[in-house]
Amino acid sequence: MAKSGHESQEDPRNRDILIYVNGAMKKRDEAVVSVFDSGCVLGDGVWEGLRVSHGHPAFLDQHLDRLYEGAKAIALDIGLDRGALTRAVYATL
């Protein structure tokens, strides 16, 4: 794991997590983005945090509405249509 100047404590539950990156599930150590990605170069991005209950994200439609609205406001292409993003969300559960 990358080191930083911030104090943190490793959570053993995160040791074997898989991360969705560009259409594929990646092991933690393989989940990378290019340093030329606009999120790195420009610091742009939008995000939504989801609460999952019984295998389903609560209020997913409202979260996706806000995500796409935020992306539109900064001219950010999510890269997935709503259906594909919904499938990607469920793939991570």
Residue ranges and their predicted role:
Residues M1-L93:
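Conserved alpha/beta cores of soluble small-molecule-handling proteins
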